[in-house]
Amino acid sequence: MNFQSKFLTRSQSLKSLLCVGLDPDYCKLPEIIKRSPEPLVHFCREIIDATAPYAVAYKPNIAFFEVFGSSGIRQFEKVIGHLKNNYPQIPIVADIKRGDLDNTARQYARYYFGDLQVDSLTLSPYMGLDTLRPFLEYQDHLVFWLCLTSSPDSIQFQKKRFSETGRTLYEEVAYVANSISPLNLGFVVGATNTYELEILRKQNPDRIFLIPGFGAQGAKLDDLLPVCGRYSLINSSRGIHFASDGLDFAARANQEAEKIHNAMQARFVFL
């Protein structure tokens, strides 16, 4: 089953758009987890098992694993393995934000799509289409191109206008994507940019959007749901998995995920 089918099946089944981010910042892990031989695996497994009833997708962030070198990469692979072995119906978005020339990009694509078999990942468009093409060859997988992020300093680049076209940089990214138009290409659009999100959705009704910035970064469901559209994954990371730093961290994560799930069901009109 390709990413789009897996996402739509899961989303319709749960009547939700919730993507649970996995950002296992070691400094914030509960003390009992820090004493584990593989703390990142231990923590992520607990969070996954606690939130799986409500997750449309999971988004593990590679940076929190890479900081531990080869041990961290092994732990990342074990987390991916746990998801694929126990929850094969839930799509995985590897948050890697890579962006390099064709030959290098091909190696990334081979590792993440070929070896790990994640369903999707995030890429930076800064170096152009060469960074993208090797990934699009894996037609059952999906690429999320960074379009307009939720970071406060994104305005320094992403909202600058091209004098030739009048388009902003984020609009240019969407324009270029539509010029090649494969549907296994989606956009990352930050939740704090609701005005721009609405415009991008109207221009791209059938593309899947990954929308980070909800929860801990301040965006609210009441603002997002009227404009994000059916083909969206609204991500919450810290707001779920760091709801508690005590022994009840998994139970609290379950409660937070359930709360978001219920709010989405109540406020979103599903076709």
From Swiss-Prot:
Q: In which pathway does it act?
A: Pyrimidine metabolism; UMP biosynthesis via de novo pathway; UMP from orotate: step 2/2
Positions annotated as active site in the UniProt record: K97
Indicate yes or no for the key word NADP: no
Q: What class of enzyme is it?
A: lyase
A matching Pfam family: OMPdecase
Which reactions is this enzyme annotated as catalysing?
Answer: orotidine 5'-phosphate + H(+) = UMP + CO2
PANTHER family per record: OROTIDINE 5'-PHOSPHATE DECARBOXYLASE
What protein does this entry describe? Orotidine 5'-phosphate decarboxylase
Q: Which organism is it from?
A: Leptospira borgpetersenii serovar Hardjo-bovis (strain JB197)
Taxonomy of the source species: Bacteria, Pseudomonadati, Spirochaetota, Spirochaetia, Leptospirales
Q: Which gene encodes it?
A: pyrF
